[in-house]
């Protein structure tokens, strides 16, 4: 019988195929497609590994682990692009990652989880704290852009200095959010047992047995997670190296590619993990994956890239394309609005996905930006 695992194991064949295509110098579109297909099962196995580890370390650290390993590939690829001077593509990928996590990943999680359970609940207190943190992230990238567009003759060096200062503030805030969620207010996030009980009570038909921490081989799954993460990074690099020529052949702009296409592929790990746990009625863990990844991109990855660009002599700053900022602000607004009550259903997931589609269409028809393409 054909099931999900059979399909994923079959897709693993695209790992050697994509590597072979790279060594044999296949056309860029073929390499792009095979690398994309190779990432799908890897993301699924990464999600399974992180979920197993989360059983041992708890939903808060598990969510952080999901977000960290999901964004590790993006961070590595961003460093490569930054070193190559592709500043605008790096910025587009940052904003695109925020948009896709809040709308696409969280939307699918709420939709598919809501189709299985009439209503799902999560900690509204944590949702409000995350909403405030995301608002800060919007402010942090909005103000440097506003300074650039409302000032006459501000120098690139001054703008980068401002961006580095803001980046330091964001990293400090990110550390404070970790302290809040894992130390001083960890009780707000440790809700795995509540979710499991509600899952057993609400689920009809076949029931998924809940594993206990002592049933999980932690070191085995850590090894799996390490191997899969390294392979994801290799495949993602193949994908990005072929991306420019492939998207040009497909008639896509670099702006659409950076904001929509790259984050969708790069966030495949978060997507699979968030949806999988949402379908098991673990919405707190699901949202900690999606929102936690968003906060890490905004409060950690972006600031680190700004500081790295400053060290490497690359003009990486927080002056973003105004249209990208509008899309980020809209995404944060609707995500905060939907998650504020601590409840979700399939319709709210549909609204998030509809917003993502509208934003995607806007970027698809957006005219070429000279410095991006």
Curated annotation (Swiss-Prot):
<feature type="transmembrane region" description="Helical">
    <location>
        <begin position="134"/>
        <end position="154"/>
    </location>
</feature>
<feature type="transmembrane region" description="Helical">
    <location>
        <begin position="29"/>
        <end position="49"/>
    </location>
</feature>
<comment type="function">
    <text>Ca(+)/H(+) antiporter that extrudes calcium in exchange for external protons. Plays an important role in salt tolerance. Does not transport sodium or lithium.</text>
</comment>
<keyword id="KW-0406">Ion transport</keyword>
<feature type="transmembrane region" description="Helical">
    <location>
        <begin position="318"/>
        <end position="338"/>
    </location>
</feature>
<feature type="transmembrane region" description="Helical">
    <location>
        <begin position="94"/>
        <end position="114"/>
    </location>
</feature>
<dbReference type="GO" id="GO:0006874">
    <property type="term" value="P:intracellular calcium ion homeostasis"/>
</dbReference>
<comment type="similarity">
    <text>Belongs to the Ca(2+):cation antiporter (CaCA) (TC 2.A.19) family. Cation/proton exchanger (CAX) subfamily.</text>
</comment>
<keyword id="KW-1133">Transmembrane helix</keyword>
<keyword id="KW-0997">Cell inner membrane</keyword>
<feature type="transmembrane region" description="Helical">
    <location>
        <begin position="61"/>
        <end position="81"/>
    </location>
</feature>
<dbReference type="GO" id="GO:0015369">
    <property type="term" value="F:calcium:proton antiporter activity"/>
</dbReference>
<keyword id="KW-0106">Calcium</keyword>
<feature type="transmembrane region" description="Helical">
    <location>
        <begin position="349"/>
        <end position="369"/>
    </location>
</feature>
<feature type="transmembrane region" description="Helical">
    <location>
        <begin position="162"/>
        <end position="182"/>
    </location>
</feature>
<keyword id="KW-0813">Transport</keyword>
<dbReference type="InterPro" id="IPR004798">
    <property type="entry name" value="CAX-like"/>
</dbReference>
<keyword id="KW-0812">Transmembrane</keyword>
<keyword id="KW-0050">Antiport</keyword>
<feature type="transmembrane region" description="Helical">
    <location>
        <begin position="291"/>
        <end position="311"/>
    </location>
</feature>
<dbReference type="InterPro" id="IPR004837">
    <property type="entry name" value="NaCa_Exmemb"/>
</dbReference>
<keyword id="KW-0109">Calcium transport</keyword>
<keyword id="KW-1003">Cell membrane</keyword>
<keyword id="KW-0472">Membrane</keyword>
<feature type="transmembrane region" description="Helical">
    <location>
        <begin position="6"/>
        <end position="26"/>
    </location>
</feature>
<dbReference type="GO" id="GO:0005886">
    <property type="term" value="C:plasma membrane"/>
</dbReference>
<dbReference type="InterPro" id="IPR004713">
    <property type="entry name" value="CaH_exchang"/>
</dbReference>
<dbReference type="GO" id="GO:0070588">
    <property type="term" value="P:calcium ion transmembrane transport"/>
</dbReference>
<protein>
    <recommendedName>
        <fullName>Ca(2+)/H(+) antiporter</fullName>
    </recommendedName>
</protein>
<dbReference type="InterPro" id="IPR044880">
    <property type="entry name" value="NCX_ion-bd_dom_sf"/>
</dbReference>
<feature type="transmembrane region" description="Helical">
    <location>
        <begin position="220"/>
        <end position="240"/>
    </location>
</feature>
<dbReference type="Pfam" id="PF01699">
    <property type="entry name" value="Na_Ca_ex"/>
</dbReference>
<feature type="transmembrane region" description="Helical">
    <location>
        <begin position="249"/>
        <end position="269"/>
    </location>
</feature>
């Amino acid at each position: 019988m054909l099931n999900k695992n059979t399909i994923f194991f079959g897709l693993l064949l695209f790992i050697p195929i994509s590597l072979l295509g790279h060594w044999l110098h296949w056309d860029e579109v073929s390499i792009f497609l095979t690398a994309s297909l190779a990432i799908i099962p890897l993301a699924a196995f990464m999600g399974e590994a992180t979920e197993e580890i989360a059983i041992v370390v708890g939903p808060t650290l598990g969510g952080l682990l999901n977000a960290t390993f999901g964004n590790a590939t993006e961070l590595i690829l961003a460093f490569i692009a930054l070193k190559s001077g592709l500043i605008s593509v790096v910025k587009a990928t940052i904003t695109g990652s925020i948009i896709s996590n809040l709308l696409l990943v969280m939307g699918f999680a709420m939709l598919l989880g809501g189709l299985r359970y009439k209503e799902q609940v999560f900690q509204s207190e944590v949702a409000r704290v995350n909403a405030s943190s995301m608002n800060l992230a919007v402010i942090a990238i909005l103000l440097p852009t506003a300074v650039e567009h409302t000032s006459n003759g501000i120098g690139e060096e001054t703008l980068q200095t401002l961006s580095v200062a803001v980046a330091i503030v964001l990293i400090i805030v990110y550390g404070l959010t970790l302290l809040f969620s894992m130390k001083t207010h960890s009780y707000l996030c440790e809700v795995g047992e509540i979710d499991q009980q509600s899952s057993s009570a609400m689920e009809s038909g076949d029931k998924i047995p809940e594993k206990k921490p002592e049933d999980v081989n932690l070191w085995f799954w850590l090894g799996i997670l390490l191997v899969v993460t390294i392979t994801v990074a290799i495949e993602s690099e193949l994908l990005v190296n072929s991306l420019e020529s492939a998207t040009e052949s497909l008639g896509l702009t670099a702006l659409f590619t950076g904001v929509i296409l790259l984050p969708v592929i790069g966030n495949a790990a978060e997507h699979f993990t968030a949806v999988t746990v949402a379908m098991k009625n673990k919405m707190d863990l699901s949202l900690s994956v999606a929102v936690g990844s968003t906060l890490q991109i905004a409060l950690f990855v972006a600031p680190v890239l700004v500081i790295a660009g400053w060290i490497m002599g690359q003009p990486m700053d927080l002056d973003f394309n105004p249209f990208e900022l509008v899309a980020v602000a809209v995404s944060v607004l609707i995500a905060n609005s939907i998650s504020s009550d601590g409840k979700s259903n399939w319709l709210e997931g549909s609204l998030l996905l509809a917003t993502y589609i509208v934003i995607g269409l806007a970027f698809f028809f957006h005219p070429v930006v000279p410095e991006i393409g």
